From Swiss-Prot:
Binding-site list for a 1,2-diacyl-sn-glycero-3-phospho-(1'-sn-glycerol): R141
GO biological process: lipoprotein biosynthetic process
A GO cellular component annotation in the UniProt record: plasma membrane
Described purpose of this protein according to its UniProt entry: Catalyzes the transfer of the diacylglyceryl group from phosphatidylglycerol to the sulfhydryl group of the N-terminal cysteine of a prolipoprotein, the first step in the formation of mature lipoproteins.
This protein's name: Phosphatidylglycerol--prolipoprotein diacylglyceryl transferase
Pathway assigned in UniProt: Protein modification; lipoprotein biosynthesis (diacylglyceryl transfer)
GO MF: phosphatidylglycerol-prolipoprotein diacylglyceryl transferase activity
Homology family: Belongs to the Lgt family.
Species assigned in the record: Pseudoalteromonas atlantica (strain T6c / ATCC BAA-1087)
Pfam families per the UniProt record, alphabetical: LGT
Subcellular location: Cell inner membrane
PANTHER family registered for this protein in UniProt: PHOSPHATIDYLGLYCEROL--PROLIPOPROTEIN DIACYLGLYCERYL TRANSFERASE, PROLIPOPROTEIN DIACYLGLYCERYL TRANSFERASE
Transmembrane segments: 23-43, 58-78, 93-113, 120-140, 173-193, 200-220, 241-261
Top-rank EC class of the record's enzyme: transferase
Amino acid sequence: MVSSYFTFPQIDPIIFSIGPLSLRWYGLMYLVGFAAAFWLAGVRLSRTNWTKEQLSDLLFWGFLGVILGGRIGYVLFYQFELFLSDPLYLFKIWTGGMSFHGGLLGVIAALWWFSRKAKCTFLQVGDFIAPLVPIGLGAGRIGNFINAELWGRTTDVSWGVIFPGAGPLPRHPSQLYEFALEGVVLFLILWLYSRKPRPIGAVSGLFLLGYGSFRFFVEFFREPDQHIGLYEGAFSLGISQGQILSAPMIIGGIALMVWAVRRNKMAETGVPKSSKAAKA
């Protein structure tokens, strides 16, 4: 029966090298995601009063926040013991390892700094960029699949995949589940929802709720990190680290949407050109 499943081919993670520099599939997916997000941001720009300079600054700092926050978050959330024994591991980015939840914290810090610089509200910036985030998430999951990493739990479904280094049994292609839900579906939901003016903070809240829910669901099919495993807890729920980190996002997203709707402060998402508009 095992032979009837798809056996993942051995794919070199490095596409090509020029001297000491190498282009990896995962890095290429980041570039593709950033380019697509930049293009879509230009489309959204036409419906707001942002300037192109402000857009470029925002995306630059947001991208930097993703990279730095993602790496720091991965080390602290998933490899903390290794970091304690080898602090330089934080800088060994060629070994791989990025955390979405860490990247989210990095983006939040970048957006907060940018909103102060642009003299607009933090949630206005968050509402503008939230529909763009799933593009990068989806591209990253494709990179995970090509690298045959972050595979799912063992299964007997007909679309199970035998990944190299994951044993002889077929597994859920959980990377593709996340690509579909956290990338495609979440993008469509946010893009369509944000086409009309919404209460400030509602789009950001919907992103937190949507991603947190999809990630929490997919974690049931994703193999837990070997050095962490599952947290059984008092009720033997067997939840993963990803689910623990996603639960606050779900709660925070619901709370933010309720707050935004109750406040009912309608506005186009974007950076107002005047301080008066920013305070409106």
